[in-house]
From Swiss-Prot:
Function: One of the primary rRNA binding proteins, it binds directly near the 3'-end of the 23S rRNA, where it nucleates assembly of the 50S subunit.
PANTHER family on file: 50S RIBOSOMAL PROTEIN L3, LARGE RIBOSOMAL SUBUNIT PROTEIN UL3C
Single GO biological process annotation from the record: translation
Keywords: Methylation, Ribonucleoprotein, Ribosomal protein, RNA-binding, rRNA-binding
Record note on quaternary structure: Part of the 50S ribosomal subunit. Forms a cluster with proteins L14 and L19.
Annotated region described as Disordered, given as residue ranges: 140-166
Gene: rplC
Species per Swiss-Prot/TrEMBL record: Psychrobacter cryohalolentis (strain ATCC BAA-1226 / DSM 17306 / VKM B-2378 / K5)
UniProt feature, compositional bias: Polar residues: 140-155
UniProt protein name: Large ribosomal subunit protein uL3
Positions of post-translational N5-methylglutamine modification: 153
Length: 212
């Protein structure tokens, strides 16, 4: 897998083409991704680059984290993320170095990963797009109920994986094949066509598209 960047979702807006067409876009803030560790096959069993970004109050950094960041010679960030890498990805990448928004270029296709918005406990109609039952005709309390879950006497049980009410959202989601509309290295901004997972202010991971 190729190296990506960790950024913060700023929100959505739109841009116009020269022909006047409106394109919905999401703006992602890319602060410098500081390299905290370079893993190799001999020591770790696989190749990867570990990065951090942003800042975190000193009181919120554990002693182990302080030592890890100090060893890399970088300021403590709001988390650590890891990207699997091959030999070509590791060229010129050293501990303490930075990866900036210019990792991507205009027109490139990317995959964006984030945590979807949490919706809490939801019923089958909202969570799984089930149809509602009759509003009248003798139905008094089961308008949004999911109905039978265990079939008949045979099998007489609820199969694993049955779609039922429960926690909705707040899951790791990846949207593939989004186009980079523009890259602003000076201000650390990526403008990506379409919507990406998560709420405004949430962390997102931007990688080169696996299907490009």
């Amino acid at each position: 897998m190729a190296i990506g960047l960790v950024g913060k979702k700023c929100g959505m807006t739109r841009v116009f083409t020269e022909a006047g067409a409106s394109i919905p876009v999401t703006v992602v803030e890319i602060s410098a991704n500081r390299i905290t560790q370079v893993k190799n096959t001999d020591v770790d069993g696989y190749q990867a680059i570990q990065v951090t970004t942003g800042t975190r109050r000193d009181s919120r950094v554990t002693a182990a984290q302080k030592g890890h960041f100090a060893k890399a010679g970088v300021a403590a960030g709001r988390g650590v993320w890891e990207f699997r890498a091959n030999d070509s990805d590791l060229e010129g990448r050293e501990i303490g170095g930075e990866i900036l928004a210019d990792l991507f270029e205009q027109g490139q296709m990317v995959d964006v990963t984030g945590n979807s918005k949490g919706k809490g406990f939801q019923g089958g109609v909202k969570r799984h797009n089930f149809s509602m039952q009759d509003a009248t005709h003798g139905n008094s309390v089961s308008h949004r109920a999911i109905g039978s879950t265990g079939q008949n006497q045979s099998p007489g049980k609820v199969f694993k994986g049955k779609k039922m009410p429960g926690q909705m959202g707040n899951k790791r989601v990846t949207v593939q094949g989004l186009e980079v509309i523009s890259v602003d290295v000076e201000n650390g901004l990526l403008v990506i066509k379409g919507a990406i997972p998560g709420a405004t202010g949430g962390d997102v991971i931007v990688r080169p598209s696996v299907k490009a």
